[in-house]
């Protein structure tokens, strides 16, 4: 799972 800038997604995405 990807994430937008500043957002956090625990599902393999994380902070970008």
From Swiss-Prot:
Conversion of fibrinogen to fibrin is triggered by thrombin, which cleaves fibrinopeptides A and B from alpha and beta chains, and thus exposes the N-terminal polymerization sites responsible for the formation of the soft clot. The soft clot is converted into the hard clot by factor XIIIA which catalyzes the epsilon-(gamma-glutamyl)lysine cross-linking between gamma chains (stronger) and between alpha chains (weaker) of different monomers. Keywords: Adaptive immunity, Blood coagulation, Coiled coil, Disulfide bond, Hemostasis, Immunity, Innate immunity, Phosphoprotein, Secreted. The keyword Transport does not apply. GO terms for biological process: adaptive immune response; blood coagulation; innate immune response. It comes from the Eukaryota. A long coiled coil structure formed by 3 polypeptide chains connects the central nodule to the C-terminal domains (distal nodules). The long C-terminal ends of the alpha chains fold back, contributing a fourth strand to the coiled coil structure. Heterohexamer; disulfide linked. Contains 2 sets of 3 non-identical chains (alpha, beta and gamma). The 2 heterotrimers are in head to head conformation with the N-termini in a small central domain. Cleaved by the protease thrombin to yield monomers which, together with fibrinogen beta (FGB) and fibrinogen gamma (FGG), polymerize to form an insoluble fibrin matrix. Fibrin has a major function in hemostasis as one of the primary components of blood clots. In addition, functions during the early stages of wound repair to stabilize the lesion and guide cell migration during re-epithelialization. Was originally thought to be essential for platelet aggregation, based on in vitro studies using anticoagulated blood. This is Fibrinogen alpha chain.
């Amino acid at each position: 799972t990807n994430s937008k800038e500043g957002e956090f997604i625990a599902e393999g995405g994380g902070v970008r």
